[in-house]
């Protein structure tokens, strides 16, 4: 029988523990352990859904995930979004280190979860000695007596426990063992495949426990769906392999949201700080919110938003010139541009600049099969009309590559967010007057979007 990855990890973990006990005997540090911890359980009760964000450099399935693994930089971003922070400490398979816990903990106020393959009481003491506030106990590698012993020690040290399960058998054990927080790992620990149906199948069977969905969470629509059946998420790999960490956290947790019609630098800064991923700069000639290139250039320089240039039936050379000079993230076509026009634009435009296409929705939806279009905008008109179209026609459609626009405001944003689009596009609904954004409305909308 072929040895599984999990079996290999556990064999090597036994060797690591033997070695660590020799170089750092428990007797040398047990009396130095501080039992004052940050309450892991309380931190998971403060928000729904909550997020346990993970510091992970490598994994057996993906290899090196994050080459530039700056723990301080990661922690200072995570602290703005996480209820707790997970730190991978396994050395051989995840390139972690027990000393990473203190590095992260000094940067944040949240509890730190030590994520490792716990099989020996020594590891629990070691984790607390290095300031972990909670540990992960996996029922796939522990029998009931081992689990009870490790969780008993954790309780003595005022540490929380995240109990991980992978199937119905382990779930029944977790309930019998009176686990307070149950993590459903969507990853098969033997072949490392991922199946979100584990969460969908197992979570309805869990009553009066805090439920965490672990592994495989990559898109905001998954969070929206699973938030109906779990309380929070543990997310690592899908964030760690991205270059712009904070932008991708916003995209994952809040959605691919955009505020369009920006004309002032101060508005762009508020939009970014509230959680938007994209900022829209309108260059269409007939728009009340048209910006000029000098202001746009300064806005882009001073903000980390992904800026989208909005054009309408304009000369291709002009679009290419503006987009490339400003290093726009994408060009949004908001007119009657046809496939031939788009083909020419794609040939002339720098490859890294994406092309989005907006549609004015009436009674039917367009086919989303255009060549060279990276994202679609469903709007109620030519933009900035403060009117919605009939959203009921979206029911049953696959909208993972669609941003919803048109008349979205503080009153209807929650309804809009449940339509399963990849994000929302705000304009007149967050304004005092055309091009002048209302900071209170923007703040309120993004507070609502963060559940």
From Swiss-Prot:
Cite the EC number. Answer: 4.1.1.48, 5.3.1.24
Q: Which family does the similarity line name?
A: In the N-terminal section; belongs to the TrpC family.
The GO molecular function terms of this record are: indole-3-glycerol-phosphate synthase activity; phosphoribosylanthranilate isomerase activity
PANTHER family xrefs = INDOLE-3-GLYCEROL-PHOSPHATE SYNTHASE, TRYPTOPHAN BIOSYNTHESIS PROTEIN
Whom does it interact with, and what assembly results?
A: Monomer.
Q: Which residues form a coiled coil?
A: none
Specify the protein name: Tryptophan biosynthesis protein TrpCF
The family database entries (NCBIfam families) matched by this protein are listed as: PRK09427.1
Which segments carry the region annotation Indole-3-glycerol phosphate synthase?
1-256
Pfam families (alphabetical): IGPS, PRAI
Specify the pathway. Answer: Amino-acid biosynthesis; L-tryptophan biosynthesis; L-tryptophan from chorismate: step 3/5; Amino-acid biosynthesis; L-tryptophan biosynthesis; L-tryptophan from chorismate: step 4/5
Record gene name = trpC
Q: Which InterPro entries match?
A: Aldolase_TIM, Indole-3-glycerol_P_synth, Indole-3-glycerol_P_synth_dom, Indole-3-GlycerolPSynthase_CS, PRAI_dom, RibuloseP-bd_barrel
- Say which species the protein is native to: Buchnera aphidicola subsp. Schizaphis graminum (strain Sg)
Catalysed reactions listed for this entry: N-(5-phospho-beta-D-ribosyl)anthranilate = 1-(2-carboxyphenylamino)-1-deoxy-D-ribulose 5-phosphate; 1-(2-carboxyphenylamino)-1-deoxy-D-ribulose 5-phosphate + H(+) = (1S,2R)-1-C-(indol-3-yl)glycerol 3-phosphate + CO2 + H2O
Role: Bifunctional enzyme that catalyzes two sequential steps of tryptophan biosynthetic pathway. The first reaction is catalyzed by the isomerase, coded by the TrpF domain; the second reaction is catalyzed by the synthase, coded by the TrpC domain.
**Annotated region (N-(5'-phosphoribosyl)anthranilate isomerase), positions in chain:** 257-451
Keyword set, alphabetical order: Amino-acid biosynthesis, Aromatic amino acid biosynthesis, Decarboxylase, Isomerase, Lyase, Multifunctional enzyme, Tryptophan biosynthesis
